[in-house]
Curated annotation (Swiss-Prot):
Membrane-crossing residue ranges in chain numbering: none
Name of this chain's protein: Homeobox protein DLX-3
Keywords from the UniProt entry: Activator, Amelogenesis imperfecta, Cytoplasm, Developmental protein, DNA-binding, Homeobox, Nucleus, Transcription, Transcription regulation
InterPro entries found in the cross-reference section: Distal-less_Homeobox_TF (IPR050460), Distal-less_N (IPR022135), HD (IPR001356), HD_metazoa (IPR020479), Homeobox_CS (IPR017970), Homeodomain-like_sf (IPR009057), HTH_motif (IPR000047)
Organism: Homo sapiens (Human)
Protein function: Transcriptional activator. Activates transcription of GNRHR, via binding to the downstream activin regulatory element (DARE) in the gene promoter.
Renumbered residue ranges of the record's region Interaction with DNA: 131-181
GN (gene name): DLX3
Any Pfam family hit: DLL_N
Length: 287
């Protein structure tokens, strides 16, 4: 009785020792024993770098894993933070200065605004106030007049040069030439301007044409008209009833009938170089 009990006790002890030895070696074994599947404490223990201190079944933050390599020797071993700056190579970093530099402030485009004419109310009606008239000195007027006699129209460089010489603006020179041309046209139209002050070849109004002679100076430029008095006057047609009543009486028929009578007529004067066809003969002389 005692011998069988001792054998059973020894077998139970060997089973317990074998089970304990299996649990102790399961940590180093690559395979898990069947009894460890239901053991929840196994998963809570630190087993890998990715799940250190993390319970099983929780979401893993992608920025908390450890990396074991360096990028171009610039980053050390450690955990990534969500807002950390990535380490790019030197070829990419040289373009970072263009992104970080602020854009230069552009100057606003200056637009010249013409001053508006002052408007005053006169008798309840708006009326623009005229600008004061430009007062030219005697030297400026003499220089402008001399230049106007040379050419009534100025090109842009010539106008700028003349304005700089006289101390005027280009607008003042342009307005003076416009007023002077209108005054000259009015005087020239009324005949108060002599012929030598007419527009010359340099003026675009002249169109490079010679000046026309005056109306009172036609004796030197007149040409003799051809003397038409030397031609004999044409003979009038006869309105005899025999010529009007007979429609078949033509010029050729009358010429054949009045051959002897036409020979008795005096010949044409010899002063004529070009023989012109004479009028038809008088049919009234033929009976």
């Amino acid at each position: 009785m005692s011998g069988s009990f001792d054998r059973k006790l020894s077998s139970i002890l060997t089973d317990i020792s074998s089970s304990l030895s299996c649990h102790a070696g399961s940590k180093d074994s690559p395979t898990l024993p069947e009894s460890s599947v239901t053991d929840l404490g196994y998963y809570s223990a630190p087993q890998h770098d990715y799940y250190s201190g993390q319970p099983y079944g929780q979401t893993v933050n992608p920025y908390t894993y450890h990396h074991q390599f360096n990028l171009n020797g610039l980053a050390g071993t450690g955990a990534y933070s969500p807002k950390s700056e990535y380490t790019y190579g030197a070829s990419y970093r040289q373009y970072g200065a263009y992104r970080e530099q602020p854009l230069p402030a552009q100057d606003p485009v200056s637009v010249k605004e013409e001053p508006e004419a002052e408007v005053r109310m006169v008798n309840g009606k708006p009326k623009k106030v005229r600008k004061p008239r430009t007062i030219y000195s005697s030297y400026q007027l003499a220089a402008l007049q001399r230049r106007f006699q040379k050419a009534q129209y100025l090109a842009l460089p010539e106008r700028a040069e003349l304005a700089a010489q006289l101390g005027l603006t280009q607008t003042q020179v342009k307005i003076w030439f416009q007023n002077r041309r209108s005054k000259f046209k009015k005087l020239y139209k009324n005949g108060e301007v002599p012929l030598e002050h007419s527009p010359n070849n340099s003026d675009s109004m002249a169109c490079n044409s010679p000046p026309s002679p005056a109306l009172w100076d036609t004796s030197s430029h007149s040409t003799p008209a051809p003397a038409r008095s030397q031609l004999p006057p044409p003979l009038p047609y006869s309105a005899s009833p025999s010529y009007l009543d007979d429609p078949t009486n033509s010029w050729y028929h009358a010429q054949n009938l009045s051959g002897p009578h036409l020979q008795q007529q005096p010949p044409q004067p010899a002063t004529l170089h070009h023989a012109s066809p004479g009028p038809p003969p008088n049919p009234g002389a033929v009976y």
